[in-house]
Amino acid sequence: MKKNRLSFWLLLPCFVGMMLLCGKNMLEHPLTTSLKTSSQPTFVQKWYTALQMQLGNRQRNGVYIGETALYALPQPLSETALSDTADVINQFYQETELPICVTAIPDAASFYSDAFPDGMPYVEQKPAIKQFYNAIDLHIRKTDAYYILEAESNDYIYYRTFPYWTSYGAYSVYRSVIQKLGFVPISYDHYTVSHVKSDARGALYQATQTDAVMPDLIDVYENNSNPLTCTVTTTLQDGSKKERDSLYDADALQTENPYQFYLGEPAPLQVVTTNVQNGKKLLVI
C-alpha cells in the first residue's frame, strides 16, 4: 500500500502536466474527482484548488473564492423553516408577553454580490427575510439588519474565511437592537479592541484550502469604564455541565475552529451570570 502511494506522488507532476495540456475536460477524470475530497492530504487539496483557479474555476465545495474574501454560495432560504420559526416566536410572545426583538442576519454574499462574476446564478435572501418579518406578530419589535449592515459594508463586518459576521458587524446591529429593548447602547469609543488572534482561518478556508485570501482577526471588545466579570455555565448535549470564569474560551484559539473562542463549543444551553446588578435577564436564541 505504501509503495502504491509513493508511486502516485511520483506520478503527480506528470498528471499536472497532462491536466494543463488537456484543459478543463481533464477535471472530470476519476483521479481528479478523488482529489476534490477533504480526505486527501492538505497540500494536495491546496494544489487542486490552485489548479482550478488557474483554469478559471473559483468555486469549490460550495464556496466562491473572491479576490479579498471567501463566500458561501448563496442558498435559498426555506420558506417552511422561516414560517415555523415565526410561529414559535409568536407563540412565545403570546405566552409570556415579554419584550422581544427579532433580527435576521443575511449572509455576506447579500452585501458583496459584485464579487461574483456576471452571469453566475445568485440567490437573493432579502425577499425571504422580509416575508419572515411580515409573519411575526406586530407587537414584536423587529430590527432589519440588512440596511444597518449595508451602510457599514465598507468596513470589516463579515469574516473573510468564516461564514459569520465579525464583532464589529454584530456591534453595528446591537446599537439598534438594544435601543428597541429600551436601553442606551454603549458608545464604540468606550471600548478597547484587542486582536487575540490575527491568523484565524475558518470553515470557508477549510472547504477551499486556498491561501489567496488573508486570514481573519479574532477581536475582543472590552468596556474600560465598566469592566465585566462573569461566569458561564454550559449544559452539554449529554446533560453534563461545564463552568468557566470568562465569556471567552481561550483554548479554542488553538483549534481548527477558533471562532468557538466566542462562548465556546455549541451547546443546548448557556447561562451567563455577570456582575451587573440591575435585576434584569436577557434571553438570546
Say what each PLM segment does.
Residues 1-285:
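Extracellular glycan-modifying ectodomains
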